[in-house]
């Protein structure tokens, strides 16, 4: 039984490790984007109040489109 179970376990671990690495990379990218957006929003909000909302919405839409393309 151990001989039959070992190869399947190894494959499962390999798939999990690869998936985790990809997920971690995506998480880091998202965190970096959010930090950049927060910094940008803070500086923009201090300078102007109303136009920032429009630019922020455009940025969010562009990021969502890019993420969807990457996922596919």
UniProtKB/Swiss-Prot annotation:
Residue ranges the record assigns to the propeptide: 2-14
Domain of life where this protein originates: Viruses
Gene Ontology cellular-component annotations: host cell; host cell nucleolus; viral capsid
Post-translational modification (record): Cleaved near the N-terminus by the viral protease during virion maturation to form the mature protein.
Keyword DNA-binding: yes
Keyword Acetylation set for record: yes
Keywords: Acetylation, DNA-binding, Host nucleus, Late protein, Viral penetration into host nucleus, Virion, Virus entry into host cell
Family (UniProt): Belongs to the adenoviridae histone-like nucleoprotein family.
Protein name: Pre-histone-like nucleoprotein
Organism (species): Fowl adenovirus A serotype 1 (strain CELO / Phelps) (FAdV-1)
UniProt lineage: Viruses, Varidnaviria, Bamfordvirae, Preplasmiviricota, Tectiliviricetes
């Amino acid at each position: 039984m151990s001989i039959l179970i070992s190869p399947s376990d190894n494959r499962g671990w390999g798939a999990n490790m690869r998936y985790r690495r990809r997920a971690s990379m995506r998480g880091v990218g998202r965190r970096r984007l959010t930090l950049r957006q927060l910094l940008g929003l803070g500086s923009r909000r201090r300078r102007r109040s109303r136009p920032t909302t429009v630019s922020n919405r455009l940025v969010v839409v562009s990021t969502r489109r890019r993420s969807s393309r990457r996922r596919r």
